[in-house]
């Protein structure tokens, strides 16, 4: 089958031919329709330090997808040939304390599709049936293919009550932008997002941001004053991994505020702990998606009017993957979709 793989230890990916995956007793085989390019895939493309330490070579990658079940293992129940599915990209052990307690997103033995094992940038993907998730017919293939990052945004944004609250989001990547739409959809009052990328800040405005702030030109404090915010933000969603963004967030939080961290800052990042301790801030680390509560919430929000369509800005045939990665690398894109049926 055709697949997009890391064949050698260096930058780039190669469209190649690989063996179609075998299907275990508890697996489903998915014929891929669409995939989306993730920031993780950009790290793999660039072959940065993280990728060099993490990605086995050779291996085909990718973990954001939608497709159709074409084969099932003999032990699989609850699915049928022809079901349209996306799937949870974190494969968990099922035996550790968190898995057995129903907290699979906290599994200490997680294996990542397209990171630690063969991925979805291919004509077929085999995964455990437990990880597959049926997509309702009213949700398009394009939207279904971005359920993985949409789930990151949902898990982060819904970690705390947002109804009537003022929300600060630092980092206008696709996940941060989707978090804007989620926060407004569930009833936040002011949703302010910061970045230095004007293209993506404009996308955030289209997704409903109260203010999209280029912090290279505009003061967050001035924006807060314009919005008549006298006490600071109630909820912070840190999506960038940029130390200065996290610092500014802590300074802008109200006493008793709550912060969810999805962005990954450098290991030795220092912060002013006085901002945390004396403000009584609650800080929560976010990884992946809750299995499968996050997935059900994603579907429910889309079915109740959440519009994520502006975040998908580019579409290419899978054979034109280099154009897709170029769009992502330019910084002037939202989500980029690759069509494996074209």
UniProtKB/Swiss-Prot annotation:
Zn(2+) 2 binds at residues 93, 96, 99, 107. Keywords: Cytoplasm, Metal-binding, NAD, Oxidoreductase, Zinc. Pfam families: ADH_N, ADH_zinc_N. The keyword NAD applies. Pathway: Amino-acid degradation; L-threonine degradation via oxydo-reductase pathway; glycine from L-threonine: step 1/2. The keyword Acetylation does not apply. Zn(2+) 1 binds at residues 38, 63-64. Catalyzes the NAD(+)-dependent oxidation of L-threonine to 2-amino-3-ketobutyrate. This is L-threonine 3-dehydrogenase. The lineage of its organism: Bacteria, Pseudomonadati, Pseudomonadota, Betaproteobacteria, Burkholderiales.
């Amino acid at each position: 089958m055709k697949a997009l793989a890391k064949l050698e230890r260096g930058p780039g990916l190669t469209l190649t031919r690989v063996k179609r995956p075998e299907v275990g007793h508890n697996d489903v085989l998915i014929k891929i329709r669409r995939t989306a390019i993730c920031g993780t895939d950009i790290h793999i493309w660039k072959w940065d330090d993280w990728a060099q330490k993490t990605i086995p070579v050779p291996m085909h990658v990718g973990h954001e997808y939608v497709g159709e079940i074409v084969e099932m293992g003999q032990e699989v129940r609850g699915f049928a040939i022809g079901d349209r599915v996306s799937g949870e990209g974190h494969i968990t052990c099922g035996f550790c304390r968190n898995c057995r307690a129903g907290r699979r997103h906290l599994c200490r033995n997680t294996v990542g599709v397209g990171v630690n094992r063969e991925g979805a940038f291919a004509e077929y993907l085999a995964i455990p049936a437990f990880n597959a998730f049926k997509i309702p017919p009213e949700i398009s293939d394009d939207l279904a293919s971005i359920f993985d990052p949409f789930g990151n945004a949902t898990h982060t944004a819904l970690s705390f009550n947002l109804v009537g609250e003022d929300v600060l989001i630092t980092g206008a990547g696709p996940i941060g932008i989707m978090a804007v739409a989620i926060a407004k959809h569930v009833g936040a009052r002011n949703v302010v997002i910061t970045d230095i990328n004007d293209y993506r800040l404009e996308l955030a405005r289209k997704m409903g941001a109260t203010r999209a702030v280029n912090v290279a030109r505009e003061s967050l404090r001035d924006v807060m004053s314009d919005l008549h915010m006298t006490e600071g933000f109630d909820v912070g969603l840190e999506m960038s991994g940029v130390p200065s963004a996290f610092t500014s967030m802590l300074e802008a939080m109200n006493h008793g505020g709550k912060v969810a961290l999805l962005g990954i800052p450098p290991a030795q990042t220092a912060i002013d702990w006085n901002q945390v301790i004396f403000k009584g801030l609650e800080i929560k680390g976010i990884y992946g998606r809750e299995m499968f509560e996050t997935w059900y919430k994603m579907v429910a929000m889309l079915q109740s009017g959440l519009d994520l369509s502006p975040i998908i800005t580019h579409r290419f045939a899978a054979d034109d993957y280099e154009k897709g990665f170029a769009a992502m690398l330019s910084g002037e894109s939202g989500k980029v979709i690759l069509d494996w049926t074209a």
